[in-house]
Regions:
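Phosphate-group recognition and catalysis centered on beta-loop-alpha active-site segments
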Residues: 1-233
Length: 233
């Protein structure tokens, strides 16, 4: 049994294109407890799974996701695959794994769109929203009540108390923060999730033996990894 839950960061993104149905299915097959997908709105108000605000990194096209129609986004191809809409990812994971939705936008529109989407799916168990401010957490808690869980993707450790007071169920820290006294103290306040990588020249979600040792010593509730097979069951 693993010492913590594995969250497949952007799906099984170490081996498959990020934020795709292919990557989500592969993550579940590899034993991930949750699949993470990013959430942005198209010009038509549909929730699509893109990490970046533009298509530039994936396709070379500088167009903003928010300016692209559903038709345009569904026609996008990269690394031999295509981006998923969030309802596609949810249909893949529901009943098989949990889902962490990394909400990339502030404001009420994205939360309202997510509420409609998750309600249409029947409010499946195991859905988490990743939110970055106490204000957005409070808004989401009012809108969703307890029908979803919330992890605070807080930019700084000193925002923990505000995020918990607003209704967060868990706190996310970075691998490089895990050994800090402030991060150690947070374990007494809430379940802590750790995003691997973004240190020692590693990409977000990537790690190595030293990183896994640091993370393991922290004893988190969950870890976000690009490769869900790095930690044996």
């Amino acid at each position: 049994m693993r010492p913590f839950r594995i969250v497949a960061h952007r799906g099984y993104s170490a081996r498959y294109p990020e934020n795709t149905v292919t990557g989500a299915r592969a993550a579940i097959a590899a034993g991930a407890d949750l699949v993470e997908a990013d959430a942005r709105l198209s010009a038509d108000g549909t929730v699509f799974c893109f990490h970046d605000a533009t298509l530039s990194r994936l396709t070379g096209n500088p167009a903003a996701i928010a300016d692209c129609s559903d038709e345009v986004l569904r026609s996008v191809r990269y690394a031999g695959d295509q981006p998923a809409s969030l309802d596609q990812i949810l249909s893949v994971v529901a009943g098989r794994a949990g889902l962490l939705v990394d909400v990339k936008l502030g404001g009420p529109e994205i939360l309202a769109a997510l509420a409609r989407l998750i309600a249409a799916a029947g409010w499946p168990d195991g859905v988490w929203l990743g939110l970055r401010s106490a204000e957005q957490i409070a808004s989401a808690r009012t809108l969703f009540d307890d029908r979803v869980s919330i992890v605070a993707l807080m930019p700084a450790l000193d925002q923990a108390e505000a995020c918990l007071s607003a209704g967060a169920d868990a706190l996310r820290i970075w691998e490089a923060q895990a050994s800090l006294p402030e991060a150690q103290a947070l374990r007494a306040r809430a379940p802590i999730w750790v995003t691997a990588g973004a240190t020692r020249g590693l990409k977000v979600g990537d790690t190595d033996a030293a990183g896994l040792q640091t993370i393991g010593a922290y004893a988190p509730a969950a870890v976000l990894l690009n490769d869900p097979t790095l930690v044996e069951p």
